[in-house]
């Protein structure tokens, strides 16, 4: 069984860790961006969230939806749907001994696609910008899954 020193010497795993940190930080930014939009536009999902703006009926008017808030929230949800599978499959892929340059290509394309997807979602850029960014990132995750299944797993 590999000890921690061996794992730290695994260049692919260290590259994955770096890119996973970048993409998780971006996803954390989306949480903050959603909160910022909610506070700036005084749009809240729950009555207790708007208690500082009044009580009773006065507070209820702040429990509503807003297109700006919903756009950021949907971009964040899309991150959750795509980044979580990338993290799981990417970790297994990293531990399977792939070529460093191939792994870096996967990680860089995924991170670039997700950052571009967020820009396309929040700006908003016309389609097919967002759709292409989604499918590029999704394709990278599928590519890693395919390579992992083909080379290392017993089916």
From Swiss-Prot:
The modification N6-acetyllysine is found at residues 42, 55, 60. Residues 3-9, 97-99, 149-155 are lumenal. Homotrimer; The trimer binds only one molecule of glutathione. The keyword Cell cycle does not apply. It catalyses: RX + glutathione = an S-substituted glutathione + a halide anion + H(+). It is a multi-pass membrane protein. Its EC number is 2.5.1.18. GO terms for biological process: glutathione metabolic process. This is Microsomal glutathione S-transferase 1. Keywords: Acetylation, Endoplasmic reticulum, Membrane, Mitochondrion, Mitochondrion outer membrane, Transferase, Transmembrane, Transmembrane helix. Pfam families: MAPEG. It is found in: Endoplasmic reticulum membrane; Mitochondrion outer membrane. Conjugation of reduced glutathione to a wide number of exogenous and endogenous hydrophobic electrophiles. GO terms for cellular component: endoplasmic reticulum; endoplasmic reticulum membrane; membrane; mitochondrial inner membrane; mitochondrial outer membrane; mitochondrion. The gene is Mgst1. Expressed in the testes (at protein level). Its main location: endoplasmic reticulum. It comes from Mus musculus. The keyword Zinc does not apply. Residues 34-62, 124-128 are cytoplasmic. Belongs to the MAPEG family. Gene3D superfamilies: Membrane associated eicosanoid/glutathione metabolism-like domain. Signal peptide: none annotated. GO terms for molecular function: glutathione transferase activity.
């Amino acid at each position: 069984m590999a000890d921690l020193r061996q794992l730290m010497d695994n260049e692919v795993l260290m590259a994955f860790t770096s890119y996973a940190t970048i993409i998780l930080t971006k996803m954390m930014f989306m949480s903050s961006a959603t909160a910022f939009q909610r506070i700036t536009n005084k749009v809240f999902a729950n009555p207790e969230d708007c208690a500082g703006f009044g009580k009773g009926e006065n507070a209820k008017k702040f429990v509503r939806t807003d297109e700006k808030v919903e756009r950021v929230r949907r971009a964040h949800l899309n991150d959750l749907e795509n980044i979580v599978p990338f993290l799981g499959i990417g970790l297994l892929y990293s531990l399977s001994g792939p070529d460093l340059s191939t792994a870096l290509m996967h990680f860089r394309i995924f991170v670039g696609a997700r950052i571009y997807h967020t820009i396309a979602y929040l700006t908003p850029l016309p389609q097919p910008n967002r759709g292409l960014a989604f499918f590029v990132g999704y394709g990278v995750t599928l590519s890693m899954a395919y390579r992992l299944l083909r080379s290392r797993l017993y089916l």
